[in-house]
Amino acid sequence: MKKTSKMIYLILLLFINLSCIKQQSNEKGRNNSELVSTSKTDTLKFTSGIRAIFQDSKGNYWLGSHNEGVSYYNGKTFEYFATNEGLTDNQIRSIEQDKNGKIWFGTAKGVSVYDNGKLINYPTNLSYPRYEWNETSGNLWFNAGAEDGINRFDGINMNYLIFPKPQNKNTDNTDNTYGVTGISKDKEGKVWIATYAALFNYDGKMVHIFDKEKLNLKDNERLHIRSVLADSKGRIWIGNNGIGVLLLDRNSTINFSEKHHLIHPTSKRNGNKSEPGTLEHPFAIEEDSEGNIWFGDLYTGAWKYDGKTMTNYNTIDKNLKSQMIWTIYKDNSNNLLFGMAEGGVYKFNGKSFDKIF
């Protein structure tokens, strides 16, 4: 009997050890030992759209596509790598650089990090979700694909964190999930996280929820958030697919698009195509070096708010070949770059747009 009990104990101990090893392997990533091989071109070959733009500390540009992987531009040539070279997924949603110079990619199926020609992958670890958001320093934040949570790298491990959900609330639509669509840090270091169904704010200690009720939406309006920006004045701009831009300033929220008469009178305030001259589907928001707020709309293109008036550049600048803007990015020289759905990158020169990639 004692031998049987001892054998069962050893088997359980072995199982626990193997589980811990598996968890550590997922948290610390999977190393692709072979060097990443890439193709090269003189011009950017992406056609599926540019969803992410990043300029690293050396001045190189990294461009993330909708479904073709990543391109690296060193000022002369474009190099490419995708799932064939070890990338977690070909849909790139965010790009960052850490303090050690490594380049991180948030993809539709996890996170990849590029380091000296090698890729290390961190698939979203659904087996070990974490509900406690313990404060750590030097965090990198990434979406978790379609999952209801967010990936956070704390400098050692990648952790999959679960959002606290609003209690007894209906998200109004079955396609509204808590998958991350945007991340922005404010001047106090708080992290604002946009999901389809709600906005979350993490202050280092607690996670605060901004749902339909807290954002004072009308009965015929629903949340379907696609972008968020914490600007230099402490205001939070929320891009909502269907009802336009919401502006959260301290404890009050207004519908910015409605205030500026940029929602069509016949709009159903959903995902349907909007009329020209409206701002109902903002997929991208950014602030330029002069404090102007820029919006990229799914159907009506580039908008600028200078604090008083709104300007729609797609109606006055014929250089913009595409209406849909996936991302707006401010580079190291304070140039504003626009990633378009047709696969090009445009720079605003102060008056009009020039295609640079």
Give the positions of each predicted feature.
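Carboxylate-rich, polar loop motifs that coordinate divalent cations or form catalytic acidic clusters
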Residues: 2-357
